[in-house]
Amino acid sequence: MALVGYGVMVGIPVISTAWVTLLGFTEVQVGRVAGADLGGLSAGAVLASLLVARVNRRYLVVAAVVITIGANALSMVTVTYEQVLWLRFTAGFGSGIYTAIAVATLAGTSKPARAFNILLFAFAFSQALELHVLPQLSMNGIYLAFIGSYVVGLIFLPWLPPRPIDKGLDVVVDVADDDTEHHSEHLHVPAYVPWLVLAAVFATYVNIGAYWTYIELASNPPPEMAEWAARVSATPEWVARVLVWASFLSIVGCLFATVLSNRFGLARPLLVTLVCQAIIVVMLANGINNVNIVISMFSFNFLWIFADVYQSATIANVDHSGRFASLLPGAQGLGQIVGPNIAASILAAGLGYGGVFIMCASASLVGMLIYLFMYLRLRKTIPALADAS
């Protein structure tokens, strides 16, 4: 179900290109529409976070599916920019509720870090499948594919627990006694911890949202962007292939993320990840060629999984009710509405794709600073949680 919910987020590069080539939208309009879709995801997730511990989750999922299918069906008969903008927000809203429930349920499992790692491992294959199949479909075919995926997702509804078992915000730590014996203690986790993680997720996804929305368009700029076009030597066919193959780096990322977290915990690898992500994005600011696009996109997918695994596992370690975990898609969706819209404004101001990539790198560094602040605070108060795996 989580894979279905994240379907639009994964397919944004292909969908963005389809909106330009099949519906005639401008690059600026694409940023607004993509932002509306992913902003709806955020709004839906926020609503779900308020209801996830109170209302039967199965009812919420059914309502979300009805909203999402209806909006996608109406998108098939609507082609004007203003109408598509609102329909994509509505589709994203339903998707946000659906995805938030799925993520909250994963966070409530006995081994949430492993559950999220399995999700992201499967995510790599679904991402590759989408990026391979969607470009071969018409605009209506893309919408039909999303409708079909939500219908299939209903098959898993009976396995969805209606309510959470544990509603506490705490963590179990191993404490050494004076006689070298060990015992476990339940420590209450300050509410600022999950909120800071969500803030870091938001900043991270400002980068991801803008990069993922515009990377294919930046590699094949229109004639009116002559100055940027002069810096681009990558071929569109090559970029399309790289998009598909880069998704498999997520698999490698899952494996490395597990190994590193077992040895160094969650926080320290994440801090390094966000710095590296800033570097591999800003390297495109001076132009795109067949070499640096491969390095950037492969590294981006590899590090994207690192960030998701560590951030999701950090929240899951302290929140078993699903309240904060269900806000993960909200923070991601909010970042993905803000990122493309900032990028669209940068393009509208004539600053070009170089400005977009600099903004992306800055957002990643902001996320790193937020997470660093949280890590340093936890080192003083709950060291075991600061370095938890």
For every predicted segment, state its role:
Residues 83, 117-166:
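Helix-loop-helix hairpin linking two adjacent transmembrane segments in secondary transporters
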Residues 264-311:
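C-terminal transmembrane helical hairpin of 12-TM major facilitator-type secondary transporters
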Residues 44-57, 253-266, 347-348:
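Helix-to-loop junctions at the C-terminal end of transmembrane segments
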Residues 43-79:
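Conserved MFS/SLC helix-loop-helix module at the cytosolic interface between two early adjacent transmembrane helices
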Residues 318-353, 360:
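A late C-terminal transmembrane helix in Major Facilitator Superfamily
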Residues 24, 56, 77-82, 265, ...:
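Helix-breaking motifs and short loop linkers at transmembrane-helix boundaries and internal kinks
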Residues 12-13, 191-244:
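Extracytoplasmic gate region of multi-pass secondary transporters
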